[in-house]
Amino acid sequence: MKIAEVSTNPSVDIALDTINIGKQALVFVNTKRSAESTAEKISMKLKTDNLELKELSETILKALSSPTKQCRRLSKCVSKGVAFHHAGLAYSQRKIIEDNFKKGLIKIISCTPSLAMGVNLPAFRAIMRDLKRYGGRWGMQWIPVLEYHQMVGRAGRPDFNDDYGEAICIASSESEKTEVLEKYLRGEPEDVYSKLAVEPVLRSNILGLISTKFARSKKELLDFFKETLYGYQYGDFTEIEIIITKILGDLDEWGFIKTDKDDFVSADEIGEINLRSTPLGDRVSQLYLDPYTANFIITSLRRALQKKTTEFSYLQMVSNTLELRPLFKVKMKEIEFVEAVLNDNAFNLIVLEPSVYDHEYDDFLNSIKTAIIFEDWMDENNEEYLLEKYDVTPGLFGMKLNLADWILYSTEELAKMLNFNEILKDISKTRFRLKKGIKEELIPLVRLKKIGRVRARKLFRNGVKDIGDVKKVDITKLTQLLGKALAYDLKKQIGEEIKEVPNGRRKGQLGLGKF
């Protein structure tokens, strides 16, 4: 196979050759930044004047209420039939790219390996530019063989009547070429390990089995896990029994399960009696929460009952949960700022601050930064602001926002179960504001259908501040602010029927002769 060299970058040359032969390709790289720069390099070599692509690039640009520099970068690439794809993009943008690649409008996608996982997006060529990625203190490490198989599995499109597909690995030298051949083409894939070996997963499953009455005793639990991949792989089941016994002890201590005996029993004795979940344990299981997280939330809420809390108190609590990991990391230049915010909110926090010498202190500071970002969103700062100030991409922020909403919903439910009515309203308000990204003053307006934070702020600035104002405001003014259809819909939502004025007819005095 002969590829014309039109640049100094082999992956760019192969991508351009793919377009020249009327095919599509996925270019796999190891970082989000590389995905973007590679897409840009390919697009700069193309001269395309396609109306459909121009319209598509405009759609990409308007995917967010306020386009970021990343949106503009992507839009420019898409106008040439090239795109980048990674977790930092908003979901709507990723969906647009995937759909239009399937349609054949987008010819090249430069992406991270996440695209190969769980997305059916075949291409004629799968180009593996990077088979190594940064592994922390270990430096650059070869990716797993299983991951390589996922990527090469994208090559070939039976639905497009391709007889074959091409998977191309790029090696920097002859020795690396030999290593790639041995490791990936001739090598064996790694073993698959059970997720139950991860303690949070095991905890959740144990509580779930007890809650659904699938397992009513420690013996039934052990019998179940003996038949799992986890039990088979672990080998020494005595060790698994020790782990399960410890987890049962934790669940009992946290109030999520109880035994038939009212008096205290040891961890060994607990296996001889029946296990039952409590109503609180049932709710934790239904919420799909890790029981450890649920206990952490409940402990934090008990502290909240004893002090004056703010929205920041609950945002920082949410940011401390395992489910939000990895958190937004504090950069060196941000330490002073983050510590200043910590000092300002110290008396309102419901999560205990560790010692600065504790290994958990960095994570604690990261939770403060994450809470700051959530609070900025609630203060109606847009995605562009978050990207510029904190280098947080819309896609990543969107994922964290969804997780935080789930944790806050779970917090609400646990507060209800425990009758923590004094703080329930504050938790609900924090969740609503975070979900909608609004200041407190906009809450009444955003409760109306089809009114988001941008429209609500526009109404507020023009004197329409609550439902009462929506009732009072003239339909003409409302139409000027929101458009005719939405203005009439809003009036209908509050129970007011407005008769539409026929086209060509005006209401009121038409001239001096009518005075």
Residue ranges and their predicted role:
Residues 1-36, 83:
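Conserved interdomain linker/interface between the two RecA-like ATPase lobes of SF2 helicase motors
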Residues 28-108, 137, 141-146, 226:
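Conserved C-terminal RecA-like helicase domain
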Residues 108, 115-132, 166-168:
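A short beta-strand element within the Helicase C-terminal
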Residues 144-181:
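Conserved segment of the helicase C-terminal RecA-like domain
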Residues 203, 208, 245-254, 258, ...:
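C-terminal helical accessory/scaffold domains
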Residues 214-235:
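Short acidic, hydrophobic short linear motifs in intrinsically disordered regions
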Residues 430-500:
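Compact, charge-rich alpha-helical regulatory domains located at protein termini
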Residues 501-515:
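Acidic, low-complexity intrinsically disordered tails
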